[in-house]
Design a protein with these regions (language model features):
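Solvent-exposed polar/charged
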Residues: 22-25, 99-100, 130, 174, ...
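A short acidic, glycine-rich active-site loop
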Residues: 51-63, 202-215
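Glycine-rich, Arg-bearing micro-motifs that act as flexible, cationic patches
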Residues: 105-127, 149, 243, 258-284
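Structural beta-alpha unit
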Residues: 12, 55, 70-106, 225-259, ...
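Small/aliphatic-rich secondary-structure junction motif
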Residues: 1-51, 77-80, 151-206, 227-235, ...
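Short beta-strand elements of ligand-binding domains
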Residues: 107-110, 135-142, 289-293
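Active-site phosphate/pyrophosphate- and oxyanion-stabilizing loops and adjacent acidic/basic residues
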Residues: 21, 70, 95, 126, ...
């Protein structure tokens, strides 16, 4: 089982390797860091200029791979390796390497302008996340931990994609001996005094959402009970806030937590095509996020 890590040249943030090694300690596997450098033009007209560029790129690749090996050496219990490849597209190169390595997960870091402890997708990472056929784990900037994965929170919407996600994450939690938390996020404005028909209707709609979420979570509990989960290792939460950031902050988050989100329920392709809710959850998540592709109906009781 292989974790392929995107590791950029002159990387000053080893968060992706840190997360990959944490995952590899929890669900055992090897970590393969891949640095992607620009590819030459490959045309006769380029001549010596192209050769000079390729020599420069090779030097950058060797340097980056050496830096990745140094970072991997900080995790002696994890089997690690580092390579560099040349390509015109970083997402394409990482997906190629994932296919070649038969990787079960890609791991990437956040954009260089992300706040420390937060996730922000660069344009390259965004394209990767939306096109990958395998799960993509995203580390917050500056991520460091000595803990294994101790709890996975599933963003649960009670649609086919969520049930598929729940089934896959339940299996991973068993393998990692991690707790599982099923969380439904409800974003609604603060309640106002019922002084008009519109505000009364708004209150009724929010209450209906929460009742539906509670019913769906009871159904999820029945399914998870059948998969061997017991009370100490299983949690349920409905987190409500006036915006996504505050809804997510309603939950407690600890070192060792991972948040899992699924692909859009309406997208026809088995890829990590994130809907607006998953994208916002990623933006405000205070812990690493795993985006999981697929919208199969497995797991529904």
């Amino acid at each position: 089982m292989t974790y392929v890590v995107g590791y950029g040249p002159h990387n000053n943030d080893r968060s992706a390797i840190e997360l990959a090694c944490q995952l590899a300690r929890s669900v055992p596997g090897d970590v393969r860091a891949v640095s992607v450098v620009p590819q030459g033009w490959g045309t006769p007209a380029a001549g010596g200029t192209d050769r000079e560029f390729e020599a420069w790129a090779a030097g950058e690749g060797e340097l980056s791979a050496a830096e990745a090996r140094d970072d991997l050496a900080q995790h002696p219990t994890v089997e690690g390796s580092a390579v560099w490849v040349s390509d015109r597209s970083v997402p394409h190169a990482l997906l190629d390497e994932a296919a070649r390595s038969d990787a079960w997960m890609l791991v990437v870091g956040s954009s260089g302008d992300a706040e420390r402890g937060r996730i922000r997708l660069s344009s390259k990472t965004d394209r990767l996340v939306h096109s990958s056929p395998v799960p993509v784990a995203i580390a917050p900037r500056g991520y460091r931990t000595d803990h294994p994965v101790t709890r996975v929170t599933v963003g649960f919407r009670d649609d086919d994609a969520s049930w598929s996600l729940l089934a896959r994450i339940a299996e991973i939690c068993h393998r990692a001996s991690a707790h599982l938390r099923v969380a439904t996020f409800v974003v609604a404005p603060p309640r106002r005094p019922v002084t008009a028909r519109s505000s009364h209707t708004e209150t009724q709609v929010i209450d209906l959402w929460k009742a539906q979420a509670a019913n769906a979570q009871r159904e999820a509990k029945t399914y998870l009970d059948s998969q061997g989960f017991d009370e100490p290792s299983l949690e349920f939460a409905i987190a409500q806030g006036p915006d996504w950031g505050r809804a997510i902050r309603m939950l407690d988050w600890e070192d060792g937590d991972i948040l899992a989100v699924g692909s859009s329920a309406t997208h026809p392709v088995a890829r990590v095509f994130l809907g607006s809710s998953a994208t916002k959850i990623i933006r405000y998540a205070p812990v690493p996020v795993v985006a999981v592709p697929g919208a199969a109906t497995q797991g529904r009781a």
